[in-house]
Amino acid sequence: MQSSGQRLRDVEQHQPLLSGGEEEVTAGRVWFIQDSCGMVCAFMTWSLVMYAEFVVNFVMLLPSKNFWYTLINGVAFNFLAVLALTSHLRTMLTDPGAVPKGNATKEYMESLQLKPGEVIYKCPKCCSIKPERAHHCSICKRCIRKMDHHCPWVNNCVGENNQRFFVLFTMYIASISLHALCLSGFHFFTCVKVQWNECSDFSPPVAVMLLIFLCLEALLFLTFTAVMFGTQIHSICNDETEIERLKNEKPTWERRVRWDGMKAVFGGPPSLLWFNPFAGLRLRMLMVRARRSGAEFSV
């Protein structure tokens, strides 16, 4: 009798059959989850980043009389904000690794011509042949390869295909949050010395309220995203998703060593491309494919 690990590996042996044309079509589609909570959280994420942009640029930097201080911090903060929002979009609109839906038909499973003792697993919820390390997401209503968790803030699952962008998103949000806190602290210190005279185009009470809210927002985002970033790096280096860790599943796969895991997620050896959320983005090709095959929505 085969062990559980052997039976699970049998699924991987049939992967060329399980991930045929349907998955290639899905990869060319625009992926978007129509979940009310997720869409609200994604909108809030963008709104809060835009608020930080407004306060940093129009309350702190532009009123400053120090040209180089304004230029250097303005370029750095806005550049990191663009990278953060791009990473958010890539995480949200990238297929996380959805298994083809409804392919576990009796006729199709018979066509696989399994050998005696070979076992494949079927997800009863989405009627899909379930590969090793795939889990069903009740929100996406799909089985996701190497599903780590479903994050409402990006309105998507974090899985095999978009984990890299999620890591970049948490890293860049943590970076702009820390930068905003430092700028706010320096601005408070400077304005108190001059008693807020000529410190801002806004009245002192309004400026103080805007800065306090920014500090609270930045502190909350910094704490949350820094923890998530550390958790994701730990999961990648240990080749274990958050679901597998919580379920305390015994590995039935050969774990990658730390750098192999990082290279598998970020693609290739260490380079600056690891930090580039635009890498691999072919907008023109994506638009052509979207017109040809339509968008894939999960309701």
Swiss-Prot record:
Q: How does it assemble?
A: Homooligomers.
Q: Which GO terms describe its biological process?
A: peptidyl-L-cysteine S-palmitoylation; protein localization to plasma membrane; protein targeting to membrane; regulation of G protein-coupled receptor signaling pathway; regulation of protein localization to cell-cell junction; regulation of protein localization to plasma membrane
Catalytic center at which residues? C151 (s-palmitoyl cysteine intermediate)
In alphabetical order, the GO MF annotations are: protein-cysteine S-myristoyltransferase activity; protein-cysteine S-palmitoyltransferase activity; protein-cysteine S-stearoyltransferase activity; S-acyltransferase activity
Protein family membership: Belongs to the DHHC palmitoyltransferase family.
Q: How is it modified after translation?
A: Autopalmitoylated.
What sequence ranges are listed for the domain DHHC? 122-171
Q: Which domain of life is it from?
A: Eukaryota
What is the designated name of this protein? Palmitoyltransferase ZDHHC7
Q: What is known of its domains?
A: The DHHC domain is required for palmitoyltransferase activity.
One Pfam assignment? DHHC
- Compartment annotation: Golgi apparatus membrane
| Lumenal-facing ranges | 63-66, 186-208
Keywords, A to Z? Acyltransferase, Golgi apparatus, Lipoprotein, Membrane, Palmitate, Transferase, Transmembrane, Transmembrane helix
Gene giving rise to this polypeptide? zdhhc7
Q: Can you supply one Gene Ontology CC term for this chain's record?
A: endoplasmic reticulum
Q: Reaction(s) catalyzed by this protein?
A: L-cysteinyl-[protein] + hexadecanoyl-CoA = S-hexadecanoyl-L-cysteinyl-[protein] + CoA; L-cysteinyl-[protein] + tetradecanoyl-CoA = S-tetradecanoyl-L-cysteinyl-[protein] + CoA; L-cysteinyl-[protein] + octadecanoyl-CoA = S-octadecanoyl-L-cysteinyl-[protein] + CoA
Q: Which residues lie on this side of the membrane: Cytoplasmic?
A: 1-41, 88-164, 230-299
The Enzyme Commission number assigned here is: 2.3.1.225, 2.3.1.-
Query: Any transmembrane segments, and where?
Result: 42-62, 67-87, 165-185, 209-229
Classify the protein's membrane topology as the record does. Multi-pass membrane protein
Function of the protein = Golgi-localized palmitoyltransferase that catalyzes the addition of palmitate onto various protein substrates and therefore functions in several unrelated biological processes. Has no stringent fatty acid selectivity and in addition to palmitate can also transfer onto target proteins myristate from tetradecanoyl-CoA and stearate from octadecanoyl-CoA.
